[in-house]
């Protein structure tokens, strides 16, 4: 059993032309692992602080500016295993309760059983393998920001609008990890009926290891014309959009950025929300392909019929 707490604060308000929203939260969760009689404190736990701020401004009656920023800072400490939380729980689940007494008077005791390796033969895991092995602490910081400008263009034709949007995201993760070894004991039955413990190995001090930090950064922008209009029972819409993005430090070939650009078109029609048709086309490209093969055209179309809107279907 572990204790966890969560606290959130939200503030919102504004005027007829300006609206804002601010949120902050803190989350803390204790660790499931408890260490006994070790010369260091591992402090297995997870802490997170997150924040968000949204601001919408009606610049004019037809122009809206939106700015959003969000992020979180979290720190996690877990046993030094190279595994995720799921892997550790699975190993504890697979370990046999009859294989060893475990901790006795602060000693890690390995008793002889039918399975002297402390685990079922087909699982390869043991919950006691995490005792005294060290720790891994991860500190992660992420930031997300975007800004968008919307402009109604009804003065040109009713239902026409334009928007431009840009976003930026970044992340940085640092690691602190240290390994250690712990002595184990095997019980030996003495002639007088008492039990003595034979010691193997020594409790060692933590040995800190270097691990490179991880980082990520990307940006995205788009500009689009939108059109939506009703003519009696006829509904039509159209979209023309340009977008561009770039990702730095991707997981594969982290020193090579990955960029994409595209133009998208879409047209839709429906009659009484009963018969529908849609056509899409995209012209997209990536700088990661060879020159002359970076762009492609991708069309798509569809038709729909909502039969439940027919008169013969209704009671």
Task: Kindly give the residue locations of the regions a language model identified.
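Flexible loop and strand-edge segments within Gram-negative outer membrane beta-barrel domains
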Residues: 2-25, 29-32, 42-123, 136-140, ...
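Transmembrane beta-barrel architecture of outer-membrane proteins
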Residues: 4-8, 46-52, 140-146, 218-222, ...
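Short loop/turn motifs that connect adjacent beta-strands in outer-membrane beta-barrel proteins
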Residues: 16-17, 32, 62, 152-162, ...
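Outer-membrane beta-barrel architecture
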Residues: 19, 64, 140-144, 157-163, ...
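Transmembrane beta-barrel strands of outer-membrane/channel proteins
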Residues: 24-26, 67-73, 164-170, 238-244, ...
